[in-house]
Curated annotation (Swiss-Prot):
This is Probable transcriptional regulatory protein SPy_0316/M5005_Spy0269. Its main location: cytoplasm. Keywords: Cytoplasm, DNA-binding, Transcription, Transcription regulation. It comes from Streptococcus pyogenes serotype M1. It is found in: Cytoplasm.
Amino acid sequence: MGRKWANIVAKKTAKDGATSKVYAKFGVEIYVAAKQGEPDPELNTALKFVIDRAKQAQVPKHVIDKAIDKAKGNTDETFVEGRYEGFGPNGSMIIVDTLTSNVNRTAANVRTAYGKNGGNMGASGSVSYLFDKKGVIVFAGDDADSVFEQLLEADVDVDDVEAEEGTITVYTAPTDLHKGIQALRDNGVEEFQVTELEMIPQSEVVLEGDDLETFEKLIDALESDDDVQKVYHNVADF
């Protein structure tokens, strides 16, 4: 599974790298985190977490600095979090998390993306109950047992630790993600491939042929919206 998460990040970074969308989305997220607390990552855990994720996605330093500088100013721009759940082809399920300054615009755009690309937006809660929220940490290593023991000693609520092809994947309770990252740093881990809060499907579906093509277009349409921050789904090997 570790390679799966690393591949997802690499795939998304490569796809988004052709545009500035990924930079803009992280810019908003960094701005909000800095505005809601101290604009100093050493004094603001949420801000430090977002900056670390931005660096994993290869967001340039000047983009990060610009967002923090904006938060230090007198701007009153307000962003609101949202979630939109829905369905794609052949049993596929999708959760879309947004961060927007215009909820009506975002809701209309997400609904249109679903409707025009073979999907159907559902009611709140129609999909999310079939997903589990977890912290996911991925880094280089091969001794899962040792990592598990280190996290337990640090009183981190760990769901699972997996080792695969030189990569360790740690699943934590969502509230213990930051604690898990710090515990691993304290034990010598210097670089992380993934540090994310994820919605993990309880079961996955396999799509092929036209269904897979339709699903890919739907995901691309959702992710291309400037207000969409994260898209989760239950399709295997995608």
